[in-house]
Every structure is written in structure tokens, then in C-alpha cells.
């Protein structure tokens, strides 16, 4: 039986059970079969089939399809319906669609499918490279990739700069998909040794027109040189380029041009309400502040042309508190701060974000109500991308553009060529509020804010000056003085790139002859030239010291202290003496050919007030730059005050003898002065008497109140619980009152009143005399020894009694009462 059982059990173990290796092989076989079916379905797929409406209609692997379902992506958009089938077939694509139409999924799905069909693993290296022009857009693409690719086994990385290059380099070798910006990627291709891109399968350029423009052209050219030519390339943007040079640069092979809205009436979404406002440059900030005050319950993005403008408007509006949360974002911020601000604005229900074009392309902020372009964009494409931050995914949105009067005609013509409809609106006068005075006050209080305002002015004017489209941007028509005043600046900052007449060249034109003659004479005499490396004294070094503050040089340039140097190409300092010149007679003689007087030079003399300053050394030349040191040569200022008649008079004005004599005889003036002072004394005496009378009255009232209080205490002590006190001494007293009864009734410090302990009958003895006060009752924690100790301590103090006084004695009666209390046993 046992053997049989053993045999039966052995036979049971020998049945065919699949091993692990068999399970893996079966799984691999099923995967190959599924992959073969997918490839066959892709070959049979018609890209222009109208039946393709959802992601389930596409031949996608289960990992991608499940990721799309989990992320709630079901229906295909127009650009996805046109681009994904072609990309699955391996074609190069040029995709163009309106903002917010789903271009990100149009290239992420082909990327995942491309690597899945190639059976890509972590050991195969980099398979897909996605390039974005901005860090914010790259982060957004990476987050979408993580959502839809959660079921794949590919490793993905984000390389956008702002972090340690060494840490990124250590992880690059293990990445299959990289989302990056052009500059950082090129840096890794040049410096990271173990980074290999020879097996790259697919290259994606999001916002390709921005990447291909002059700002990134050199980086893209260098980056493409590292990539293999057998790759598949996908280019997507809201405004696509068809230039042959761009296509040849990226080695595109027979690209398919996909435009989901090529036949559309407008290049912008139909549910986007667009308008523009013509506002002078000096009223731009006033209009913007009024706009924010009227849209407090909205989510707004305000675009400026430079980061300095963003910082100034944010800092100044933050002080004025328009009533809406404010944020700012520009390219000079740290990456951590940029990501935090992006996250805060995305999750906010209401708020205003001041930003540059770093968020103008591709970045998806949910539920944006308004897009305000405070500065005119450089072209129509930039306008389309900016307004694309609202009205995304069939939602509604509104956009408004601020145009300067000189920019209106030219820019509207550019927008008409791009099929962008705009409606002109006017600003209500009651909604305008001038903030110029407030900004000027803030600039006066904060030098840093004033510096930001100056830099904002310069950055804006520089951007206008460097624009290529001169039909739209005319620098000479700008009201620079009014714009500077609207920023709260006291004066218009100097602009170096605003060319004018070369004043220094014109000023020195008549001195050319004397300068050349003096140089030739010095050469003939054989005088040695000044050695640049000669030893300088410590005083000369002290005279050449400059302020090392980081803002000092900027302040000098902005305030125009460099003088003519701001309008010329030279960097020479203002009032720097180049050469000690002769007087006018010698200059005229030198110009006429008389070279005999050119060698005789005299020190230059400058008149400062009533004194003269002789410039005969380098130290005196440096003295001209110091206003503080020049004060001692100037006239001393006089301080004036205005009298009641509005006449300006010196602070210390003394009368002379003649002026005093005109007023009359001295005796009469003396009597007049004494009479006037007597009247003042009489008036003051009346007030003093009234004050003394009030003090006496208050004193009497206090005394009466004190007496009433003492009477009430005496009645309470004798009555024993509310009874009437007995004022006579009983039968044996014969009606005579005790004169010290009142004094004995005064409370003594350290003793308690016995009133209220018993009735009136208990306080009197059989003989009619008042009993002495009882001893203090013992507490529950005291015994006889404690009470005896207290009595002993009182005797040691000499039996001194302390009488509490409410106030100091004021008359004889008070003193007698006090003495009687002290003498009483």
C-alpha cells in the first residue's frame, strides 16, 4: 500500500508541468505574434480614413492604449487624427495646428510605438530625443509622457539645465527617451563622454519654428551633426515653416505636411475673443493697473518684452496691492523658482502672472481667462502663440493687445496676413487711474525699485530699437520722456544706442593742429614718453579709487553723469582732462601756423564762485570729479525764511542802529515794552488764580470724601453686622463723650477690624465699657506655638504701630489725629 502510494505519487509528479523557461518563451511568442499583428495593421492602415475617430481605432500596443485610457484620452483631435497614422508608418512629419489642439500627444504616441516595435531596452541606449525651446514646455511634455507611458518599461529623463551637469551626465547613459532644451543637450553632447546617440530612432522638435529661428539656429546645427541620418523626424508647431533650408538642415526625407486647420478662417481658436486697445506709451501702465482692478476674479497672464519690465511691474504693483494675487516669471530666475511659480499659477483659481515669452509657447495653464500683451509682439507668430495660452481644448478665452499709436497700422496688417481677427475697443475714462505719482513715491523710497525702473526703460527701448520690422516699430516716434515719467522716474535715462552728433569730435576739431604740433615738438626734443608701469604714490592711488558698489556704475550711466561719453563710442569719463591746453590766443596762433607758442603751456584756471581753481596736477584733475571736494570753492548758501507777509528774510536777521532809531525814543519803547509785558502778566495771573481755586476745591472734596469714608468704617465697626453703633459710654459714663473715641476707631496696620464678628451686645462689658479687640483667630494650620511666636516677633519690634495714611496731613486737625494714634497703647 505504501509502495503503491509512493508509486502513485511519483507518477503524479511526472505529469507535464510548464517550467519557468517555457512560460517566458510562451510569453515572448505571444508578444511576437501581437507585434506582428500590429505591424500588419499599420501597413493596412489608411491615414486618411474617416473612420479613425478614437485612440481605440489606431493599431496601438496594449501598454500605450492602457496608458491613454488611464489618462482619460479617448477622442482624437484633428492634428492627432492626421499625424499619428503617418508617424506610425515611419514618415517624417511637418505638423501645424492651432494652439491647444493636442500636438503633444501627436508626437508622444509615435515615440512610444516606435521604441516598442524596435523592442528597445535600457541596454540599447538613447532611442528618442524630444527638443523643446523652453524649460517650462519641456517639463510639461515630460509629465504627459510619464502619464501615457506608465505601463512601458522605457527609462525617460528630463535635461533642461538649472541643475548639476555632473549628476545629469551620470544618468544619461541609461536613458531611452530624453526631453531636453537645445543648449543643455548640446552641452552634454560635447562634454559627456559616455553619451551615445548613434542608435537614435526618432527626433522630435516641438515648437519647431522657434527652435529653428536665429536664437537656436547654431545650437540646432551643432546638435544635428551628432545625430544619425537614418532617424525619423517629427516637427510640430502652431506656426510651421516650409523653408527648404530648414528642411535640409534637419535631413528630412520627403516630409508629410500636416495642417489640421489650413483651411480655417482664423489661425486662432474660434472660441477666443480677441481685441486690441490703442494706448499711448505713457499711459500703458495706468491702463494695465485699471484692467487688473476690474478683473479681480480672473486668471490673467500679462506678457512683456523683457525680464526687467516683468520685475519692475511686479515689484511696483505688489506695493500698490491691486487686489489680485501677483506672480512673475522670466528666464533669469532659478529653475526651482520657475517650477514653483508655474505650479502655483496652475493650481490657482484667481491670479495674475507677469511673464516674458518663456511661457508663450506650448505651456498649458488650466482655465486662463485673459491673455494681456502689454508690449507689442515682434511678429504675428509670437502673437498667435501668446494668445494660445487661453481658449485651450475647446474652452473659452479672451485676449487683449496694447498697441502704441505708431504700431497700430503696421501690426494689424501683419495679423491680417495670418488670418487673425481683431476688434478695437476703447477704455472707459472712469476705469483709468494714474499711478505715476505713486510709482514716483515708491522709487524715491526704494533705490532698488528706481534702478529696476531705469533698467526696464532701457530694456524696452532697446527691444524696440533692435526690431527688424521698422514699419511697425519706429523708435523715433516713441514718447521716451512720457514713458520715463509713467515709470515714476524723475528724468529720462541716457541710452547709449541712441546715436547723435559726435560732440567730442566736433569739440576737438579746432585743436587738432595744436595737438599734432605739440606731439611733434616733444618728439624732436627727444623727451621720453610716460611709462605706463611707473611707480604711483599712495595718494595717487587714493585719488583713483572708485565706488565698488554693484549699482554705482549703472547709476552714473543712467543719470547721464558720463556726459558726452553716453553719446559716443568711447568709454572715457566725464571731465577727464586729456591735455593741459594753452589760452585762446595760443590756440589761434597754433591754428594759423605759429608753432613757437605751442610749447609754452600754462595751468588751466577754473572759476568756481568767488574763488579760482588752478588745474596744475593730476590730483587737481581728479578733484573735478568730486562734488563734495568742490564745495569749499563754491559760495556758501544762504537760508531764507518767509514771514507772515510772504517776504523772504534771512534766518538770522539783526537790526542796525538806524533801523532801531526809526522806531522812536528808547524811553518810550521801554515804557511800551513794560506795559505790554504787564498786560501779559495780568492775563496770566487771572489764569493762575483760577487754577489755584480749582485745586483748593478739589482738595476740599477729597477731604470730605475721606471723612465720609471714615464715618462709614466707624459705624460698621461698632454696629457688629449692620447694627447701629453706640456713641455713649453706658450708665457709668454720665453722658460725657470720650474725646479719643474717634481716634481709637481709626484702623491700624496689621490689625483687622472686629466689626461684623458679633452683635452689638457682645462688644460691651457688664460695666458698660467697650471691650478691647479680640485676638486674631488662628488658622486651621496654626497651633499655640505659632501664635506665641507671632506675639514674640511683635514685641521684638518694640511695639511699634503703623498707621496707614491715605494722604499727607494738610491741617492741624490731621496732625493731632495722627499724633493721638501714635501715642495710643
Swiss-Prot record:
Biased composition (Acidic residues): 730-739, 761-770, 805-816
Motif (Q motif): 53-81
Job description of the protein: ATP-dependent RNA helicase required for ribosome biogenesis. Involved in the release of U14 snoRNA in pre-ribosomal complexes. Required for pre-rRNA cleavage at site A2.
The record's note on its domains: The Q motif is unique to and characteristic of the DEAD box family of RNA helicases and controls ATP binding and hydrolysis.
GO molecular-function term, one example from the UniProt record: RNA binding
Listed SUPFAM superfamilies: P-loop containing nucleoside triphosphate hydrolases
Protein EC: 3.6.4.13
Start and end residues of each Helicase ATP-binding domain: 84-258
Residue intervals of the Helicase C-terminal domain: 284-439
Keywords for this protein: ATP-binding, Helicase, Hydrolase, Nucleotide-binding, Nucleus, Ribosome biogenesis, RNA-binding, rRNA processing
Residues bound to ATP: 97-104
Entry-linked CDD domains: DEADc_DDX10 (cd17941), SF2_C_DEAD (cd18787)
Biased composition (Basic and acidic residues): 19-34, 677-691, 700-714
UniProt record, GO biological process: rRNA processing
Protein name per Swiss-Prot or TrEMBL: ATP-dependent RNA helicase DBP4
Subunit structure: Interacts with the U3 and U14 snoRNAs. Associates with pre-ribosomal complexes.
Disordered: region residues: 1-34, 508-536, 676-825
Homology family: Belongs to the DEAD box helicase family. DDX10/DBP4 subfamily.
Predominant cellular place of this UniProt entry's protein: nucleus
Motif (DEAD box): 206-209
Alphabetical list of Gene3D superfamilies matching this protein: P-loop containing nucleotide triphosphate hydrolases (3.40.50.300)
Signal peptide, first to last residue: none
Amino acid at each position: 500500500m505504501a509502495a503503491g502510494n509512493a508509486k502513485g505519487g511519483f507518477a503524479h509528479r511526472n505529469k507535464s508541468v510548464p517550467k519557468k523557461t517555457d512560460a517566458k518563451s510562451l510569453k515572448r511568442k505571444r508578444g511576437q505574434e501581437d507585434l506582428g499583428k500590429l505591424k500588419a495593421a499599420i501597413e493596412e492602415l489608411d491615414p486618411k480614413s474617416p473612420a479613425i475617430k478614437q485612440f481605440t481605432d489606431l493599431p496601438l500596443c496594449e501598454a500605450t492604449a492602457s496608458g491613454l485610457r488611464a489618462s482619460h484620452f479617448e477622442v482624437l483631435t484633428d492634428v492627432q487624427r492626421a499625424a499619428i497614422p503617418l508617424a506610425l508608418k515611419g514618415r517624417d512629419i511637418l505638423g501645424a495646428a492651432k494652439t491647444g489642439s493636442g500636438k503633444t500627444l501627436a508626437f508622444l504616441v509615435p515615440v512610444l510605438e516606435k521604441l516598442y516595435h524596435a523592442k528597445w531596452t535600457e541596454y540599447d541606449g538613447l532611442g528618442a530625443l524630444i527638443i523643446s525651446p523652453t524649460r517650462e514646455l519641456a517639463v510639461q511634455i515630460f509629465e504627459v509622457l510619464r502619464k501615457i507611458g506608465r505601463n512601458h518599461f522605457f527609462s525617460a529623463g528630463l535635461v533642461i539645465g538649472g541643475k548639476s551637469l555632473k549628476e545629469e551626465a551620470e544618468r544619461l547613459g541609461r536613458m531611452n527617451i530624453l526631453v531636453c532644451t537645445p543648449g543643455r543637450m548640446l552641452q552634454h553632447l560635447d562634454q559627456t563622454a559616455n553619451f551615445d546617440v548613434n542608435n537614435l530612432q526618432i527626433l522630435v522638435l516641438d515648437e519647431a519654428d522657434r527652435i529653428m529661428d536665429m536664437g537656436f539656429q547654431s545650437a540646432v546645427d551643432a546638435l544635428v551633426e551628432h545625430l544619425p541620418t537614418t532617424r525619423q523626424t517629427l516637427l510640430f508647431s502652431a506656426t510651421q515653416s516650409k523653408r527648404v533650408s530648414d528642411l535640409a538642415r534637419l535631413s528630412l526625407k520627403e516630409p508629410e505636411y500636416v495642417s489640421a486647420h489650413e483651411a480655417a478662417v482664423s489661425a486662432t481658436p474660434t472660441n477666443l475673443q480677441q481685441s486690441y486697445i490703442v494706448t499711448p506709451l505713457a499711459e500703458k501702465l495706468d491702463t494695465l493697473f485699471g484692467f487688473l482692478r476690474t478683473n479681480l476674479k480672473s486668471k490673467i497672464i500679462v506678457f512683456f518684452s523683457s525680464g526687467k519690465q516683468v520685475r519692475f511691474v511686479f515689484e511696483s504693483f505688489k506695493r500698490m496691492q491691486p487686489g489680485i494675487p501677483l506672480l512673475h516669471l522670466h528666464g533669469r530666475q532659478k529653475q526651482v523658482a520657475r517650477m514653483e511659480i508655474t505650479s502655483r499659477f496652475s493650481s490657482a483659481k484667481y491670479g495674475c502672472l507677469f511673464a516674458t515669452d518663456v511661457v508663450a509657447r506650448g505651456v498649458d495653464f488650466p482655465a486662463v481667462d485673459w491673455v494681456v500683451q502689454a508690449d507689442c509682439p515682434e511678429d504675428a507668430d509670437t502673437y498667435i502663440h501668446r494668445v494660445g495660452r487661453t481658449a485651450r481644448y475647446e474652452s473659452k478665452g479672451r485676449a487683449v493687445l496694447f498697441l502704441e499709436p505708431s504700431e497700430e497700422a503696421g501690426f494689424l496688417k501683419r495679423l491680417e496676413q495670418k488670418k487673425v481677427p481683431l476688434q478695437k475697443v476703447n477704455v472707459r475714462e472712469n476705469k483709468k487711474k494714474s499711478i505715476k505719482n505713486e510709482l514716483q513715491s515708491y522709487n524715491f523710497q526704494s533705490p532698488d525699485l528706481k534702478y529696476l525702473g531705469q533698467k526696464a526703460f532701457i530694456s524696452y527701448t532697446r527691444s524696440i530699437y533692435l526690431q527688424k520690422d521698422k514699419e511697425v516699430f519706429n523708435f523715433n516716434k516713441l514718447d521716451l520722456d512720457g514713458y520715463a515719467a509713467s515709470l515714476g522716474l524723475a528724468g529720462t535715462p541716457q541710452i547709449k544706442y541712441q546715436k547723435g552728433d559726435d560732440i567730442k569730435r566736433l569739440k576737438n576739431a579746432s585743436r587738432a593742429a595744436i595737438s599734432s604740433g605739440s606731439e611733434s615738438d616733444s618728439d624732436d626734443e627727444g623727451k621720453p614718453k610716460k611709462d605706463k608701469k611707473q611707480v604711483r604714490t599712495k595718494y595717487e592711488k587714493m585719488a583713483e579709487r572708485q565706488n565698488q558698489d554693484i549699482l554705482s556704475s549703472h547709476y552714473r550711466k543712467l543719470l547721464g553723469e558720463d556726459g558726452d561719453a553716453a553719446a559716443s563710442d568711447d568709454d572715457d569719463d566725464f571731465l577727464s582732462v586729456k591735455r593741459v591746453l594753452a589760452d585762446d590766443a595760443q590756440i589761434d596762433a597754433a591754428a594759423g601756423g605759429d608753432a613757437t607758442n605751442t610749447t609754452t603751456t600754462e595751468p588751466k584756471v577754473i572759476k568756481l564762485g568767488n574763488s579760482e581753481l588752478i588745474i596744475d596736477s593730476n590730483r587737481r584733475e581728479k578733484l573735478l570729479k568730486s562734488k563734495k571736494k568742490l564745495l569749499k570753492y563754491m559760495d556758501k548758501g544762504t537760508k531764507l525764511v518767509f514771514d507772515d507777509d510772504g517776504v523772504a528774510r534771512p534766518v538770522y536777521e539783526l537790526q542796525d542802529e538806524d533801523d532801531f532809531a526809526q522806531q522812536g525814543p528808547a524811553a518810550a519803547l521801554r515804557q511800551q515794552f513794560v506795559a505790554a509785558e504787564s498786560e501779559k502778566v495780568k492775563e496770566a495771573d487771572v489764569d493762575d488764580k483760577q487754577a489755584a481755586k480749582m485745586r483748593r476745591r478739589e482738595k476740599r472734596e477729597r477731604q470730605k470724601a475721606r471723612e465720609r469714608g471714615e464715618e462709614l468704617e466707624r459705624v460698621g465697626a461698632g454696629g457688629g453686622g449692620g447694627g447701629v453703633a453706640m456713641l455713649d459710654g453706658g450708665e457709668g459714663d454720665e453722658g460725657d463723650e470720650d474725646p479719643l473715641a474717634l481716634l481709637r476707631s481709626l484702623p491700624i496696620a496689621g490689625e483687622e477690624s472686629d466689626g461684623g464678628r458679633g452683635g452689638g451686645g457682645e462688644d460691651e462689658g457688664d460695666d458698660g465699657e467697650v471691650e478691647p479687640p479680640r485676638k486674631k483667630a488662628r488658622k486651621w494650620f496654626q497651633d499655640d506655638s505659632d501664635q506665641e511666636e507671632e506675639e514674640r516677633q511683635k514685641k521684638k519690634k518694640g511695639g511699634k504701630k503703623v498707621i496707614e495714611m491715605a494722604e499727607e496731613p494738610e491741617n492741624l486737625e490731621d496732625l493731632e489725629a495722627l499724633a493721638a494714634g501714635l501715642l495710643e497703647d
